[in-house]
Amino acid sequence: MSLCGQYRLTRLFVYLGLLIMGGMSAPAAAQDRYVLAFGDSLTAGYGLRSGEGFAPQLEDTLRRNGIRAHVINAGVSGNTAGQGRTRLKWTLDGLKVKPDLAIVALGANDMLRGLPPSRTREDLDAIMAEFKRRDIPVVLAGMFAPPNLGLRYMTEFNSIFPDLARKYGAPLYPFFLAGVVGDPKLNLPDRVHPNFQGVKKMVSGIAPTIIRALQD
């Protein structure tokens, strides 16, 4: 092949290479996703060491599933739904970023104190409405009242969560303590709050619902 022919061939390969490179885009960088865990002691990590609570364990699980998540712990031990309602607006106003998703996990203390289910419903409804007003999707974590509170109380309380999930089109995780409540191996000595292993089970239960919500 002549030098002229080699030159033309080289130019052709360079041109084709530039076309190929120009048509290829770099993979999109993983997007940071912010999840607000808004609840009570079950969210706050009562009685646990740093890194053992719900928020850090959920964040770790989401990251292991390819989601560059930042889970914001907005749990306050002892909070009822009413107390959560009171602090919701200033909690959201104080955040540096708007959450991509919120987990609402309140109502356990209402039930333990025997507060009227109608009051709990009203407070949770207001919380869900505020998130909707701010265009923040919610996963609602439900709670079940035990039979010793009576059939009427149990029926009224347990219906709150599926009713509100339907009203606001929110994914419902039916029972936040599924597989944990009543198991001494998964709870602190008070038999109320989950230990590290208990929280791990809670996270493994709710994580698929969170992942689906973040992917929608």
Model features per residue range: what roles?
Residues 2, 22-25:
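Position-driven detector of the extreme protein N-terminus
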Residues 1-9:
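N-terminal secretory signal peptides that target proteins for export/translocation
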Residues 13-23:
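Bacterial N-terminal signal peptides
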Residues 40-43, 48-50, 78-81, 110, ...:
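Short, flexible micro-motifs
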